[in-house]
Amino acid sequence: MNYQPTPEDRFTFGLWTVGWEGRDPFGDATRTALDPVESVRRLAELGAHGVTFHDDDLIPFGSSDSERYEHVKRFRQALDDTGMKVPMATTNLFTHPVFKDGGFTANDRDVRRYALRKTIRNIDLAVELGAETYVAWGGREGAESGGAKDVRDALDRMKEAFDLLGEYVTSQGYDIRFAIEPKPNEPRGDILLPTVGHALAFIERLERPELYGVNPEVGHEQMAGLNFPHGIAQALWAGKLFHIDLNGQNGIKYDQDLRFGAGDLRAAFWLVDLLESAGYSGPRHFDFKPPRTEDFDGVWASAAGCMRNYLILKERAAAFRADPEVQEALRASRLDELARPTAADGLQALLDDRSAFEEFDVDAAAARGMAFERLDQLAMDHLLGARGAAA
């Protein structure tokens, strides 16, 4: 297989990813600032489909209207020159100290109103640039101490904010949807809507739930010790996987933001297998940080590695699914039986069926092997390249 990405693969990168200067809580920047125009051009050369941005990635905070116009003009020209797209945008409601207690759920009402206006302004720009999805990551929406935040009131304010944003895009006739990005902690001690499940439940309480989905990130769910492919499967099942952030993470620790495939490789394999077999058609968006040890050559090598790893895993997953021995193993593990309704004949037929309870041989059923180990080893063989690739 050719592992050279093309725009048809729909790989996208946030400007903040390759543009990360390497500054962390313990050390200053190790790289200089990267011009967004340079990011667009270099990513296009690597075969990416598009870029995404926070408002402050593209337009420095506090810019005048004329400065804002020039920043957008240069960026738009770079998009036109390269054919790169902007499928998604988002708002930075976490860097400036005004957001130290959050944006949509800050205890201060004036901060909440400012956060909404800042978001609405960038939604206008996102639509202007062709974005179809608007991500909301509430990194500062949370608390470090129990008395600091009435979570019920905070959720009311969160609902109010999203309902207002939904009203705004509807009134403007914008063809854009929102994707809530969960995270359990960091930078706040505890963040509201910490997992995919929390976000899905919250969405059902909104006035226009059809406008809202989720943007799960590999590392965020794994920080909570959760199975990321399972979370994605539930989002797909709910029809709410509006966007996805791909990166690498090694277990329950700080948000590592490694390049995709550099963390839990088995989970990455099952994730790609799921996305490809489920027919997910959205961008494959990389939200990672090139390590601060790297110069700019390393930045671009890291970005290229994200795409290459995805394509390798896509090939391995396709080979796994096409392998006749795997197909036989899937049947032996009775995956086809799981796909059959348990009681398509209805409740009464179930109650009347003596073989379902009175005559059910629990000992015989308990003695059946599931053959999962053989199936899993076949997956490992494909992941590790010990079996042939798909034709």
Swiss-Prot record:
GO terms for cellular component: cytoplasm. It catalyses: alpha-D-xylose = alpha-D-xylulofuranose. GO terms for biological process: D-xylose metabolic process. One of its GO terms (molecular function) is magnesium ion binding. InterPro entries: Xyl_isomerase-like_sf (IPR036237), Xyl_isomerase-like_TIM-brl (IPR013022), XylA_actinobac (IPR013453), Xylose_isomerase (IPR001998). Mg(2+) 2 binds at E217, H220, D255, D257. SUPFAM superfamilies: Xylose isomerase-like. Binds 2 magnesium ions per subunit. Pfam families: AP_endonuc_2. Homotetramer. HAMAP family: Xylose_isom_A. This is Xylose isomerase. It comes from Streptomyces albus G.
